[in-house]
């Protein structure tokens, strides 16, 4: 039987690169009943040991990423927009107009760029850099370096 609740939990928990603690906690809690030993190293990797029935057989290693790409708030403009930079490798061509959830208080926003009627002709066809994009949000409860 497939555990869709676990899959949903792992897919919806925040785990931006450098802040994977929530993902790590879920994984450890899920594998505890099956493990003989669980350790985390200085990089946050989970190392699990399970004794086999036959020591002569081959060893098995499972490896997977816990982190996900995201953004970090770098500035709040005087008119209240959030400036941000990428955390991980995100293609700038696909983020405009996307909804985002920012910070521990889960503030909702939308990624935007200077309106077309205020843009120069070369800006209208170029892919904007992250420094030219902003997040428009519903209310402010954020600080610089918030992850989201």
State each model region's role.
Residues 1-140, 146:
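N-terminal hydrophobic/helix-forming segments and targeting peptides
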């Amino acid at each position: 039987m497939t555990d869709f609740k676990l899959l949903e939990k792992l897919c919806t928990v925040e785990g931006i690169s450098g802040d994977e603690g929530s993902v790590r906690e879920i994984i450890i809690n899920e594998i505890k009943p099956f493990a003989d030993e669980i350790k985390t190293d200085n990089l946050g990797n989970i190392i699990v040991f399970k004794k086999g029935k036959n020591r002569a057989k081959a060893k098995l290693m499972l490896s997977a990423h816990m982190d996900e790409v995201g953004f970090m708030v770098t500035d709040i403009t005087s008119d209240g927009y959030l400036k941000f930079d990428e955390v991980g490798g995100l293609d700038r061509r696909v983020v405009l107009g996307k909804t985002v959830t920012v910070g521990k208080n889960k503030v909702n926003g939308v990624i935007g760029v200077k309106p077309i009627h205020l843009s120069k002709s070369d800006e209208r066809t170029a892919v904007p850099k992250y420094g030219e994009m902003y997040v428009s949000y519903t209310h402010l409860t954020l600080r610089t370096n918030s992850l989201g």
